[in-house]
């Protein structure tokens, strides 16, 4: 529970590395330059993206150059600028930190919660946003499979109808944001990276979430969700839930229009101006493809695992 038509695609994973390197080179992407400094710093190997809290600061580079040695990411940087990182929670420590955050934020709202499994499941990926190794946000992506989705427990009729229409379903669950941080940038970045996993990399086209009825309007207004199922009791968290659905094509259109344009936030009252720009998204997708193991995607056909990648 949650509190543009491009060039030809590369469906062969063996060709993707060459394809993606050309794409990244075209965007001049190699390093994440710290704001207000001429110095740049490499991302750590398990970091998907490092993001300034200030939404007006542009991202200069997103991809780790594997040939460079590790170094202090704050060396030579303006330490008055805050940076958070988004990682896939692959270690027991990262997953424990995410579980603690989920439990703390859910308990504050009177929800039940269960800890994340010790290891990443083949059909689920948990992302963690952290500042100085402190978890400040987390979200879990669930991919449809013969085992089904969590939303099937309450909304089997609705999900069955979508599958019958040929929709490729995924779900976002276990969203938790540290109430002290209260950053639209962190929330938008987590959602955008989760979208990249589900849509750009995996080829899923429909996102399902279960939310408290009080939060329905927020997700409709801020991300473009529509109500798909009535209010029912979610026994996993012991709270009422409404099923919402987002067509990823709508999200893609909004990202193309508003992504990377925080100056539109007052006019376009949604989260999309706080998303990454289209070139930044392409670079992050490239990093995901190069750093995440194929085993995560082994339950899908090759054509779906690599859907959405551009190759010139």
Residue ranges and their predicted role:
Residues 152-250:
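Acyl-donor binding region in acyl/amide transferases
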Residues 35, 39-57, 137-150, 165-173, ...:
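Short charge-dense sequence patches
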Residues 78-167, 177-179, 200-201, 222, ...:
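A conserved beta-strand-loop-helix scaffold within acyl/acetyltransferase catalytic domains
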Residues 2-56:
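Extreme N-terminal leader/anchor segments
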Residues 15-19, 26-39, 146-159, 207-211, ...:
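Hydrophobic transmembrane alpha-helix bundles
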Residues 239-311:
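Charge-rich, low-complexity intrinsically disordered segments
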Residues 42-92:
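Conserved N-terminal entry element of GNAT/NAT acetyltransferase domains
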Residues 96-99, 217, 252:
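Generic structural signal for individual residues within well-ordered alpha-helical segments
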